[in-house]
Amino acid sequence: MNKEIEKLLFNPIRLKTISFLMTVETCTFKSLLDVTDSTKGNLSIQLKKLNEAGLIKIEKYFQKSYPTTDYSITKKGKKSFEEFYNQLLSYK
């Protein structure tokens, strides 16, 4: 596993985010706030890092004249999470 990706996933907020995104197709910022129990500012920073690493996808659009942002996990994100999870299981 890439050491940079491993380092990214050891952060509790990023790990909760990736774990949750593995279970849903897309979600909103509000959903991620609830799941991670984080502040808006901190979550925004962590999402930016995950996006820059190519682990998540951020889509912004307007819905009924209101700005909306959806988050989803990428193929790279799924693969990285699975490798990270399996690596943790191997430390028995």
Tell me the role of every PLM-derived stretch:
Residues 39, 52, 75:
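Short glycine/serine/threonine-biased micro-segments
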